[in-house]
Regions:
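N-terminal beta1-alpha1-beta2 submodule of the flavodoxin-like/Rossmannoid cofactor-binding fold
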Residues: 1-74, 153
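FMN-binding flavodoxin-like domain, especially the glycine-rich phosphate-binding loop
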Residues: 24, 28, 55-156
């Protein structure tokens, strides 16, 4: 079986998750950037699609990839994932990120967690998070996100 993992990432976490996912898959697996690669799906039996979520939106490259390839994807085995802090069981969350047809067709749809790499963040995001951490009570309800490898294994 030949599998593609198509991803888009802002700071590298989604690519890292794609690389972890690859270790759980069998056969030939290619990791492809939705931003950089022209992707010919006809050579693949299965496709996993993942992106990171910022301000409630997934990268436009993932949205465009899904729209452009929707008909073909609906005839393939697919899995969908996001890297974010939102739990996978948040009602209606995935419907704002992926076409409903893909969600209904997918073998598995999940959030695989994520991580905050402050060194890679732009100045605005870095200042925002450092400011939030200074607010009384914020740290009580906040824990640094982590990549959920067990959820990645389920996706495979």
């Amino acid at each position: 079986m030949k599998t593609a993992i198509v991803y888009a990432t802002k700071y590298g976490c989604t690519k890292e998750c794609a690389e972890i996912l690859k270790t759980y898959l069998h056969g030939e697996v290619n990791i492809l950037s939705a931003k950089a690669d022209k992707i010919n799906l006809s050579q693949y039996d299965a496709v996993f699609i993942g992106g990171s979520v910022y301000m409630g939106k997934i990268q436009k490259e993932i949205t465009q990839f899904c729209k452009r390839n929707l008909k073909q994807l609906l005839h393939m085995k697919i899995g969908l994932f996001v890297c974010c802090y939102t739990p996978k069981d948040t009602e209606g969350f995935f419907e704002t990120l992926y076409p409903i047809e893909l969600i209904n067709h997918a073998s598995y749809v999940t959030s695989v967690g994520g991580k905050m790499d402050y060194e890679k963040m732009n100045v605005l995001y870095r200042k925002l998070f450092h400011s939030l951490k200074k607010i009384d009570g914020f740290n009580e309800g906040f824990t640094e996100p982590e990549i959920n490898e067990s959820e990645i294994k389920k996706l495979a």
